[in-house]
């Protein structure tokens, strides 16, 4: 004889659905506001991140017929796969501005990725409330914990492609899924977690299909490497393996940033660990484990940003959808806690844009335009908008100097010879002590603001 009341069970289910819909309806305006904020900033000539100008410069070099992958003696480095540059170059022919083109592509990719999460959650059996909560969680994390939404960077394009590949895989289109996953890798090379997890999961589900999927990925990946060498005359793997310092301090900082938004969702997704798991539970847990392990490994490197844990955010969003669908959200507190988490960080997030920075950027662009010629720009976007010629990849060359892979004497001599009309750096130490000493001897600081430090040759007024 049962002891529970069907009316009590019905009431509990109804309360859970109300709690979930409240969470969705409260989270949606926050996401819409932040997404609109990022989208409206797309045309602004304000640097969002040093990556923007760097990506735009390579797209412009491609359009101009220059080398997309300069040989090692060059002071400009390209350590990204090629596909995103072709995409941005195509859009630049419409916009006239490569940075704006990259931002538009990023924003569209963001929306496409959210659409893919909705479709994947539906494929995994989630109803509309759970689907929406999963997508809104991911949307909020990307907006609050990073500055990548509508930023000229290929990360979100790569994720959108790989999520489309996962959707194809769940629909049984194994070879098309493998090809799409590899396309994502040729957009951004750090997107390893999802292909790895999908391959292992499919092997466990259907050995023949899993072997077909892995073989198709390997074959298309190797074909891409051969095509790259034929097109560019060099090895893509060698281009990607640029020297970079690593440290435990970098890893600790990345873990702290991850914990700020992921600790509570990770706790909630432990609901997928149960004696009897569905095949989708296993897929999401594999994906999450791979994303966290690879993200942690990559996070030790200099210059690694919040994007290294985007795969973890996607896996958590799908996991939350499954947990919410299964448990109906056991009580309102978890939903309200997530809302509080995002609400408290709205004013303390990675999006640095406002009237003050816009004014500074306009003045800095005018300053660079007034001193035409080759320039050293850490914020390459400022140089591009000013019509200046960026001559040095500050981050990658700086890392090469710090690791001993390159000798800074050549650049130090060029600086002492006043080869550059202007220098713009984030710090005097960006290019190491030898170059810093050369700057101190040959250049004077003109001004400093939120965009960095600006130097002119000492013999110029």
Where in the sequence are the language-model features?
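Membrane-interface alpha helices of multi-pass inner-membrane proteins
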Residues: 162-164, 168, 174-189, 194-202, ...
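Transmembrane-helix signature of polytopic, membrane-embedded enzymes
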Residues: 117-143, 159-160, 174-176, 280-282, ...
């Amino acid at each position: 004889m049962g002891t529970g009341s069907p009316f009590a069970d019905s009431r509990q289910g109804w309360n859970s659905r109300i709690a979930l819909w409240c969470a969705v309806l409260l989270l949606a305006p926050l996401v819409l506001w932040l997404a609109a904020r990022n989208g409206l900033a797309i045309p602004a000539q304000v640097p969002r991140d040093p990556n923007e100008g760097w990506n735009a410069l390579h797209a412009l070099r491609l359009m101009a017929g220059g080398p997309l992958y300069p040989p090692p003696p060059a002071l400009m480095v390209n350590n990204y796969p090629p596909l995103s540059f072709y995409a941005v170059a195509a859009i630049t022919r419409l916009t006239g501005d490569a940075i704006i083109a990259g931002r538009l592509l990023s924003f569209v990719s963001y929306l496409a990725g959210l659409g893919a999460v909705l479709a994947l959650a539906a494929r995994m059996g989630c109803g509309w409330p759970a689907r929406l909560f999963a997508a809104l969680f991911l949307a909020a994390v990307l907006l609050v914990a990073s500055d990548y939404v509508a930023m000229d960077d290929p990360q979100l394009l790569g994720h959108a492609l790989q999520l489309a590949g996962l959707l194809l895989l769940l629909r049984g289109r194994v070879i098309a899924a493998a090809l799409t996953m590899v396309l994502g890798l040729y957009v951004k090379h750090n997107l390893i977690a999802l292909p790895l997890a999908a391959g292992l999961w499919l092997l466990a589900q259907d050995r023949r299909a899993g072997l077909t999927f892995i073989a198709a990925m390997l074959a298309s990946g190797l074909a891409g490497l051969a095509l790259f060498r034929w097109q560019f005359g060099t090895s893509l793997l060698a281009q990607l393996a640029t020297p970079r310092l690593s440290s435990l301090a970098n890893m600790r900082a990345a873990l702290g940033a991850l914990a700020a938004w992921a600790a509570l969702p990770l706790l909630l997704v432990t609901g997928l660990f149960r004696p009897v798991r569905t095949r989708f539970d296993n897929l999401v847990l594999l994906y999450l484990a791979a994303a966290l392990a690879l993200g942690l490994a990559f996070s030790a490197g200099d210059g690694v940003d919040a994007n290294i844990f985007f795969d973890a955010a996607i896996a958590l969003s799908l996991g939350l959808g499954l947990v919410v669908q299964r448990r109906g959200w056991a009580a309102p507190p978890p939903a309200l806690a997530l809302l509080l988490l995002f609400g408290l960080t709205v004013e303390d997030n990675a999006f640095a844009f406002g009237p003050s920075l816009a004014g500074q950027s306009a003045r800095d662009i005018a300053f660079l335009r007034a001193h035409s010629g080759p320039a050293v720009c850490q914020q390459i976007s400022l140089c591009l908008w000013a019509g200046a010629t960026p001559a040095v990849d500050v981050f990658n060359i700086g890392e090469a100097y710090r690791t001993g892979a390159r000798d800074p004497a050549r650049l130090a001599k060029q600086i002492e010879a006043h080869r550059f009309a202007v220098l713009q750096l984030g710090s005097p130490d960006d290019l190491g002590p030898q170059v810093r000493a050369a700057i101190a001897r040959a250049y004077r600081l003109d001004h400093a603001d939120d965009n960095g430090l600006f130097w002119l040759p000492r013999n110029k007024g």
